[in-house]
A protein has these predicted regions:
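ATP-dependent phospho-/nucleotidyl transfer catalytic cores
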Residues: 5-88, 101-104
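Conserved catalytic-loop position in the HRD/HxD motif
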Residues: 90, 95
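Active-site-proximal structural scaffolding
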Residues: 80, 84, 89, 119-127
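Helical subdomain adjoining the active site within ATP-dependent kinase catalytic cores
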Residues: 17-40, 167-237
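Hydrophobic transmembrane helix bundles of membrane-integrated enzymes that assemble
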Residues: 66-68, 96, 208-210
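Active-site activation/catalytic loop segments of kinase-like enzymes and analogous catalytic loops
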Residues: 100, 108, 120-191, 209-225
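Activation of the activation-loop gatekeeper triad in protein kinase-fold domains
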Residues: 110-117
Length: 237
């Protein structure tokens, strides 16, 4: 079993075949209280059943249902055969070293290969770098007091309404464009050509991207050291 599953499925459960949640999900969230930016608070057991409408766009799955789907799709033994690759598995910029004196092919080096492997599911291999390089701004996860954002939240009839003005910085937009052009489009095209692109590929990628922040660290307001998350950072990330 590849170590990369330790970033995803193993953080959702205690044992591989469990049909209930455990792992980091239970440690971080289950039975806890969620403090919202508007000053209200509610149990996580209620919070994760809310549907989200973000800047007018309604998400079809609640957090609970999205995690149920993730537990199924990210299982180490998938329901259908899946293409695999040799990859680092956790190659965000924090795990890359740039050597300005190196050759063109050796200027960038990977380190911390804790989740590397020879048979990593191809759709999972680039997900950590996609999230952490493009979407996870450090002011969300690590320096929340420096986060500058206009954000409002409200709950109405089971829907969590969130409006915000956050946008990707120009640099992170360039990272995203580069990843799409040089990683994701070639990968998806190759898998499709070889008849190895599962019908659930979009859901699988979305499930992995959900786990990247949610199971990386406790995202509840007040959690985290040395800089506890603010309620704004908690809901935005």
């Amino acid at each position: 079993e590849e170590a990369v599953h330790g970033l995803y499925h193993r953080r959702l459960v205690d044992k591989e075949l469990d049909e209930h949640f455990g792992g980091r999900l239970r440690e971080f969230y289950l039975g806890r209280q969620v403090d919202l930016p508007d000053g209200n608070s509610l149990p996580f057991d209620q919070f994760w059943h809310l549907h989200w409408r973000v800047n007018g766009r309604l998400h079809t799955l609640s957090l609970h249902d999205a995690l149920l789907r993730a537990r199924q799709l990210l299982a180490p033994t998938p329901a259908q055969a899946m293409a695999a690759v040799t990859a680092h598995g956790d190659d965000h910029t924090g795990n890359l070293l740039y050597n300005p004196d190196g050759s063109r092919d050796g200027a960038i080096s990977y380190f911390d290969p804790a989740f590397a492997g020879n048979h990593i599911p191809a759709l999972l291999a680039p997900c950590k770098s996609l999230y952490h390089i493009c979407y996870a701004h450090p002011n969300m996860l690590y320096d929340p007091d420096e986060l500058r954002i206009e954000l409002s939240v409200s709950i109405d009839d089971g829907v969590l309404q969130i409006d915000h003005d956050w946008q990707l910085t120009p640099l992170r937009q360039q990272f995203l464009t580069s990843q799409i052009n040089h990683v994701w489009e070639p990968l998806l095209r190759t898998l499709k050509q070889k008849g190895m692109l599962p019908t659930t590929w979009r859901d699988t990628i979305c499930a992995a991207l959900l786990c990247c922040p949610l199971l990386c660290k406790n995202l509840l307001a007040g959690a985290g050291r040395p800089n506890p998350l603010t309620a704004d950072a908690s809901i935005l990330v």
